[in-house]
Amino acid sequence: MGQELCAKRLQPGCSCYHRSEGGEAHSCQRSQPGSTEPAVFELTEASSSTASFHPRGLEAASAQKLKSKRPRSNSDSFQEENLRQGLPWKKSLPFGAASSYLNLEKLGEGSYAKVYKGISRINGQLVALKVISMNAEEGVPFTAIREASLLKGLKHANIVLLHDIVHTKETLTFVFEYMHTDLAQYMSQHPGGLHPHNVRLFMFQLLRGLAYIHHQRVLHRDLKPQNLLLSHLGELKLADFGLARAKSIPSQTYSSEVVTLWYRPPDALLGATEYSSELDIWGAGCIFIEMFQGQPLFPGVSNILEQLEKIWEVLGVPTEDTWPGVSKLPNYNPEWFPPPKPQSLQIVWDRLGGVPEAEDLASQMLKGFPRDRVSAQEALVHDYFSVLPSQLYQLPDEESLFAVSGVKLKPEMCDLSASYRKRHHLVGVNKCW
C-alpha cells in the first residue's frame, strides 16, 4: 500500500511513503517566522540534475515503494470518480516521480509554498500538492524539513497523510491527502455556531490527535481552524506541521513567537520560552469555544498587549498567587490596572451554557497558569464526552471515529452551501452536512 519517507535526507532516490488517501481540499499551509536551529535530519545539496517542478508536468527522481499499514480514509467518491474517468492513470508509474501527478487548480499560497489540488496518475486519487520553492543559496526552508521529518513518524487517523515527496532542482513538493475543507471554511459555511453534536465529534478528534502527538513528544505550536482539515464525512486531521517541534519532557526552551496571535496562550504572549504540551491545549480550547460561538474568542487585535488585555478581561489579571513566576516573564507589566476579576466562561460565551459539561472542559483548557491546564489525554475522558460510544476509546490509532457504527455528523443549523448543492443537484452527495 505504500512507502516510508526517508528520515535521513530529502534527495532524488530517497524512499517516500505512500498510502491510500481520503478526504478533500484545504487552504494553503503557511510558514511563520521561527527559530533557525539545525535541521532535524541531514539534508543534502538542494540542487540536482532533474528538471524543475511544473504543476502539470512533474519530472523528478523515482522512489522505492515500501509497505504501509495505514488504512484508507474516506474521500469524496463522487468527485473523485469523475476525475478518474477523465484522466489517464497507470499503476506502473513510480512514486517520487513528478510525472506521476497532475495539477488541477491552485488552492492557495503562503510565504514559502503554493498548494495545488491535484490527482495521482498512479491510482487516480485526489491529492494536495504543496510546492516549496528552494532558494539557490539557502536551499530548502527549515520549516519544510521539519514538517517532513515529523510527519514521517506520525501515523494516526487524525494527522494529515503525507503520501509522497517529489524533489527537483528548484522545488520540493509534498504530496498530501486531499481533504474536503478546513474547519475555518466549514464554520464560515455554517455561521452562528456549529451543531453541539458536531462540535463534540470534532473536539474529540482534535484532542485525540493532540494526545497522540504529545505522546510522541511533538508539539504542533500553530493550532488554528485553518490548520484542521475535514473530510466529507467529518474526519478531522491536524495539518501544517511547519512550526511543530519535537519536545522535551516536561519542557524545553523555544521561541515565544509561535501560534497565530488569536490562539496564542498568555504564557507565550508574556514571552515565556519554556513550555510543553499546554501550549497546544490553550489553542484547542479557543477553537472549542469558537465552534460553539461561530467567531474567534479574542479577535481583532494587532499586538501582544491588546491580546493580553482581551484575555485578562475574561480570566482576570494574574498575580504571583494565581500564577507563580508570572512577574518574572519578559512582557509582564506590573502596572496593569484596574485588575479585572475572572468571569464565568458561559457569561462571556453564552452557547457554552446550553451544553452539559462544555464550560467545565473549556475552563480546564483555558487556564492562565500553564501547569493548571488539562492534558489532551485527560480531556478525552472528561464527562463532556461521556455520551459518545465507548468503542471510540478502543480504536487503534489509525482507525477513524467514523468506523464505529452510528457515529456521524448531524445537519448544521445554518448551511450557506445548501442552495449551491441544490442548484447543482448535489443534495445527496455530502449527506453529513
Swiss-Prot record:
Keywords: ATP-binding, Kinase, Magnesium, Metal-binding, Nucleotide-binding, Serine/threonine-protein kinase, Transferase. Its cofactor is Mg(2+). It catalyses: L-seryl-[protein] + ATP = O-phospho-L-seryl-[protein] + ADP + H(+); L-threonyl-[protein] + ATP = O-phospho-L-threonyl-[protein] + ADP + H(+). Residues 52-336 form the Protein kinase domain. The active site is at residue 173. Its EC number is 2.7.11.22. ATP binds at residues 58-66, 81. Pfam families: Pkinase (PF00069). Residues 46-83 are annotated as: Disordered. PROSITE patterns: PROTEIN_KINASE_ATP, PROTEIN_KINASE_DOM, PROTEIN_KINASE_ST. It comes from the Eukaryota. The keyword Lipid metabolism does not apply. InterPro entries: CDK (IPR050108), CDK15_STKc (IPR042761), Kinase-like_dom_sf (IPR011009), Prot_kinase_dom (IPR000719), Protein_kinase_ATP_BS (IPR017441), Ser/Thr_kinase_AS (IPR008271). GO terms for molecular function: ATP binding; cyclin-dependent protein serine/threonine kinase activity; metal ion binding; protein serine kinase activity; protein serine/threonine kinase activity. Serine/threonine-protein kinase that acts like an antiapoptotic protein that counters TRAIL/TNFSF10-induced apoptosis by inducing phosphorylation of BIRC5 at 'Thr-34'. Belongs to the protein kinase superfamily. CMGC Ser/Thr protein kinase family. CDC2/CDKX subfamily. This is Cyclin-dependent kinase 15. It comes from Mus musculus. The lineage of its organism: Eukaryota, Metazoa, Chordata, Craniata, Vertebrata.
